[in-house]
Swiss-Prot record:
Transmembrane segments: none annotated. This is Probable FKBP-type peptidyl-prolyl cis-trans isomerase FkpA. It comes from the Bacteria. It is a lipid-anchor. Residues 1-20 form the signal peptide. Keywords: Cell membrane, Isomerase, Lipoprotein, Membrane, Palmitate, Rotamase, Signal. Present in outer membrane vesicle formulations which are used as vaccines in human. One of its GO terms (molecular function) is peptidyl-prolyl cis-trans isomerase activity. A lipid is attached at residue 21 (S-diacylglycerol cysteine). Residues 167-253 form the PPIase FKBP-type domain. It comes from Neisseria meningitidis serogroup B (strain ATCC BAA-335 / MC58). The lineage of its organism: Bacteria, Pseudomonadati, Pseudomonadota, Betaproteobacteria, Neisseriales. Residues 29-48 are annotated as: Disordered.
Amino acid sequence: MNTIFKISALTLSAALALSACGKKEAAPASASEPAAASSAQGDTSSIGSTMQQASYAMGVDIGRSLKQMKEQGAEIDLKVFTEAMQAVYDGKEIKMTEEQAQEVMMKFLQEQQAKAVEKHKADAKANKEKGEAFLKENAAKDGVKTTASGLQYKITKQGEGKQPTKDDIVTVEYEGRLIDGTVFDSSKANGGPVTFPLSQVIPGWTEGVQLLKEGGEATFYIPSNLAYREQGAGDKIGPNATLVFDVKLVKIGAPENAPAKQPAQVDIKKVN
């Protein structure tokens, strides 16, 4: 049994390492996002005894780790996997020593990490090229302006209040999209306007929000070097991704009679 637990730990480590490769941190799932795997809500007693329910729970736990590996491109042979598990469980002779099993798993992990790194590099190159092409075409559209840093923006509603500085706290409403239109974050999904220090978000936001007056609205087109660069962010923002944000500057400072609320997602936080 000791061998099973050690191999399971290595398997889980492989899944987590592959998932983390090239990513800063994963955004917590919003209320609108579906669970990774669907589940039938019902009486667990239908599975059987407490022992059988626990067995099912352990299978689900291991299955999730293996599914995570598969999603990162590291598939295993389930037939061989279950054969080995059954042999150990039944006390039969197994085809590997504990040392050999650890050596094989470490080699497997290294190979998968190398594949993940190569994929990350390829994705970064492709995303950068797509982003540059998008921004080149977008720059010629009516109302779109480009700053010296490369940030593009379009004012959709002029505000009438004050303009913030980079040292201010601001309250905003926003929606973030990839250039293919995929929405990856929004204040609406997070429960309403969010409040944060303007100096603690990605450079494209720090610069862009300063162009607005209170009540003003704009669309920001943020090149990757002003966003998350080659590292990307979470599961939705790939390496060198160009981002599009619709933003409304509700006010400078926190809402009256309400504490400052940090963004529920990571998608506009500053990259260290």
